[in-house]
Amino acid sequence: MSGTMRPRDGYAKVLARLFEGGSAVGLSEARLIERFAESRDEAAFAALVDRHGPMVLGVCRRLLLDPDDADDAFQAVFLVLARKAGGLRRKERVANWLYGVARRVALEARKRPRATVADDAAVLDIDARRPSPLDPAAVASRREDDARLHEEVGRLPERYRVPVVVCYFEGRTHEEAAALLNWPIGTVKGRLARARDLLRARLERRGVTVPAAFLASALAAPELRAAVPSALASRAVAAGLAAGASPSAWMTAAALSTSVRALSEGAIQAMFYAQ
């Protein structure tokens, strides 16, 4: 089980119940989703938040430098999962699905009024624990570079995007990805290499020259796997349970802010029209 969160308020208990007598490795993505979809199992949903939360929060923070916006987007992503869990077709690829939702939600949140670039620079300073202020122009440039990179990752064919999400954004080894996806290790490595080539070529067409080594480093950046505060994880789990209580219960759940509701509803509508 991931060590990125230090649960409290019962969060640890539901995870302990799920993993009692065994390891999280033995519980497949598909089985966790099935358990939640079938019986709204709190422990199963908590495990999904624990397993994929660092990637989701990392993406939200890279695209939304305001931490409150990122937290809202994080909760909205898992609320969408709770509402759509029963209809997921390729449950073993939920990481790829969550990445797509996280990117969509974060980009929608960017359209709302947000902090100035100078404020964004201060946020980055705190996160990186840097003693000197950051150049606002550099912050704006990095923000746009991140947006371009994630836009192009989102445009990759699924067979190339999936290993990028699993290996780079979630930090799994080639062997772990191969076991998860039921692919030969050579296929994982080959598709990652092809994904990098496609990304580099597409970014260059947009006027962004990215050396191969730099691209690999950017994709595997540690901040793409952010430690999830236990309070935030608990709110996401509570929101997921509220979404499963009844078709309308999630709209009035105390655990949900107006922003989280709006972002999740917008994402679901966008997914409907994209079908």
Predicted regions and their residues:
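Hydrophobic topogenic segments
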Residues: 4-21, 26, 67, 72-73, ...
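Short helix-capping/turn signature of helix-turn-helix
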Residues: 39, 51-54, 63, 165-172
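Short, flexible helix-adjacent loops and helix caps
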Residues: 41, 61, 86-90
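Acidic, Ser/Thr- and Pro/Gly-rich low-complexity regulatory segments
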Residues: 27-32
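A short, charge-rich alpha-helical start-of-domain segment used by transcription regulators
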Residues: 34-58, 68-71, 82, 151
